[in-house]
């Protein structure tokens, strides 16, 4: 898995961080560790070798810039070279809100295309636009039903032919006509291989009918280096492929290989799938990606994620916190927000110093604890939530019984509440920079000691 790659790279760099003296021998030892970590993640050996030579040359020959120590300079060199390996400059999906846009998703069967269609619709929906889905895959059993379930989950219109009596081209034509009120049409096409001439011809027809703003190739991250051949085959067949979406990176030991292989053919990776949920789609930024991989965090993405999941009740609770009020009501609202943000391990990876260092078991334990805390608070009266100091022996017994937990767990919750309240105690309106909104104020206050 990618967190294993992150752990191995972090351990290699720790040898530099913890060293009393950095010499040529240590640099070579660290480079060897980096090589091993990348090759285990299925990154092309030639790419790894060329990158290693560049790291060694710069680490030995270059003098650190003013204000940088030798250690910091070497870590920066490694960071820069890893970013280069993945394509350097991020490229975003550009959509004009004033015009109707069409996105065509193509890829091999089993790459995760249908799920990615729904994820992309959800991503666009969160940007304030009105997406709609067209199910044009009539060949895979249950493809329409799968997309229908996902579209209902995110409340996005869907057009398709459950009877499979129409051709994909007919479905797309009719779908465009029926979904006129939508800003962005996302078309889920049938999975295909480069040798399937009829399917490639079908895709070309769809392209002519829809005149898509972007054709996105969906690639399975578990393919590792083989992703390069697949991406190249599609790029040769359909020269207008605008970008790549790499899926299944959360559970692949070959994710690094897939990303570097695709980057090698100069096909821009715009999105990566980081989990099974409809919200587990991220724009791909090589700098942020490597930063998180090395445990340096990614606060900008974390703040964006918190803003995405905030609703009216969260806003109200944040207003209360910023005014100095913090009860179990506010705590509950914050736990709700954290739960919506995604897997705990992914969230912790965005916080500097954590990266891939949070054990899977610890992340699962934390997620379970958050759920249990919410169940315990559901067993409390509003009076108890607003005045936690009222919770003494008899109330403790009643709450524990109602939640189906031990009294010690209620005490653990109250202790967590007291600690959190203390952390929020120093918050004063206007004290923190406004970047990231109200939630940004709170998160920055908690992450940095002043």
UniProtKB/Swiss-Prot annotation:
Top-level taxon in the UniProt lineage: Archaea
Residues reported to bind GTP: 107-114, 188-192, 247-250
Single GO biological process annotation from the record: SRP-dependent cotranslational protein targeting to membrane
Keywords, in A-Z order: Cytoplasm, GTP-binding, Hydrolase, Nucleotide-binding, Ribonucleoprotein, RNA-binding, Signal recognition particle
Reaction equations catalysed: GTP + H2O = GDP + phosphate + H(+)
Catalytic activity, EC: 3.6.5.4
SUPFAM superfamilies assigned to the protein according to its UniProt record, in alphabetical order: Domain of the SRP/SRP receptor G-proteins (SSF47364), P-loop containing nucleoside triphosphate hydrolases (SSF52540), Signal peptide-binding domain (SSF47446)
Cellular component annotations (GO), alphabetically ordered: signal recognition particle
An example molecular function term from Gene Ontology annotations: ATP hydrolysis activity
InterPro entries: AAA+_ATPase, P-loop_NTPase, Signal_recog_part_SRP54_M_sf, Signal_recog_particl_SRP54_hlx, Signal_recog_particle_SRP54_M, SRP/SRP_N, SRP54, SRP54_GTPase_dom
Subcellular location: Cytoplasm
Protein family per UniProt: Belongs to the GTP-binding SRP family. SRP54 subfamily.
Function: Involved in targeting and insertion of nascent membrane proteins into the cytoplasmic membrane. Binds to the hydrophobic signal sequence of the ribosome-nascent chain (RNC) as it emerges from the ribosomes. The SRP-RNC complex is then targeted to the cytoplasmic membrane where it interacts with the SRP receptor FtsY.
Oligomeric form and interacting partners: Part of the signal recognition particle protein translocation system, which is composed of SRP and FtsY. Archaeal SRP consists of a 7S RNA molecule of 300 nucleotides and two protein subunits: SRP54 and SRP19.
Description of its domains: Composed of three domains: the N-terminal N domain, which is responsible for interactions with the ribosome, the central G domain, which binds GTP, and the C-terminal M domain, which binds the RNA and the signal sequence of the RNC.
The protein's name: Signal recognition particle 54 kDa protein
Organism of origin: Methanococcus vannielii (strain ATCC 35089 / DSM 1224 / JCM 13029 / OCM 148 / SB)
């Amino acid at each position: 898995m990618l967190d294993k790659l992150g752990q191995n790279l972090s351990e290699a760099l720790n040898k530099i961080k913890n060293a009393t003296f950095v010499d040529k021998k240590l640099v070579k030892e660290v480079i060897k560790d980096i090589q091993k970590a990348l090759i285990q993640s299925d990154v092309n050996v030639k790419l790894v070798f060329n990158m290693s030579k560049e790291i060694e040359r710069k680490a030995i020959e270059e003098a650190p810039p003013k204000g940088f120590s030798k250690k910091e300079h070497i870590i920066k060199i490694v960071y820069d070279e890893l970013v280069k390996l993945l394509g350097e400059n991020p490229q975003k999906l550009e959509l004009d809100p004033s015009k109707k846009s069409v996105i065509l998703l193509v890829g091999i069967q089993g790459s995760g295309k249908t799920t990615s269609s729904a994820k992309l619709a959800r991503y666009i929906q969160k940007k304030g636009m009105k997406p709609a889905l067209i199910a044009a895959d009539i060949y895979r059993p249950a493809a329409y039903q799968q997309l229908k379930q996902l579209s209902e989950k995110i409340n996005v219109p869907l057009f398709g032919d459950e009877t499979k009596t129409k051709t994909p081209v007919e479905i797309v034509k009719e779908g465009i006509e029926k979904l006129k009120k939508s800003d962005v049409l996302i078309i889920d096409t049938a999975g295909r291989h480069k040798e399937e001439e009829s399917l490639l011809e079908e895709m070309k027809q769809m392209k002519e009918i829809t005149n898509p703003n972007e054709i996105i190739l969906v690639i399975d991250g578990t393919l590792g280096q083989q992703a390069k051949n697949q991406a190249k085959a599609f790029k040769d067949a359909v020269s207008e492929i605008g970008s790549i979406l790499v899926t299944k990176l959360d559970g692949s030991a070959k994710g690094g290989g897939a990303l570097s292989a695709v980057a090698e053919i100069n096909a821009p990776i715009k999105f990566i799938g980081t989990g099974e949920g409809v919200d587990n789609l991220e724009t791909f930024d090589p700098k942020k990606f490597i930063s998180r991989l090395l445990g340096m965090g990614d606060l900008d993405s974390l703040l964006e994620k918190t803003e995405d999941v905030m609703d009216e009740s969260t806003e109200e609770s944040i207003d209360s916190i910023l005014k100095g009020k913090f009860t179990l009501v506010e705590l509950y609202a914050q736990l709700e927000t954290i739960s919506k943000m995604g897997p705990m391990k992914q969230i912790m990876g965005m916080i500097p110093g954590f990266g891939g260092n949070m054990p899977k078991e610890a992340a699962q334990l934390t997620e379970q604890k958050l759920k249990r805390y919410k169940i315990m608070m559901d067993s409390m009266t509003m009076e108890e939530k607003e005045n936690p100091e009222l919770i003494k022996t008899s109330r403790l017994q009643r709450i524990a019984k109602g939640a189906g937990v031990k009294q010690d767990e209620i005490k653990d919750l109250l202790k967590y509440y007291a600690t959190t309240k203390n952390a929020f105690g120093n918050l004063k309106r206007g004290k923190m920079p406004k970047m990231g909104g109200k939630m940004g104020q709170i998160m920055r206050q908690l992450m940095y000691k002043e």
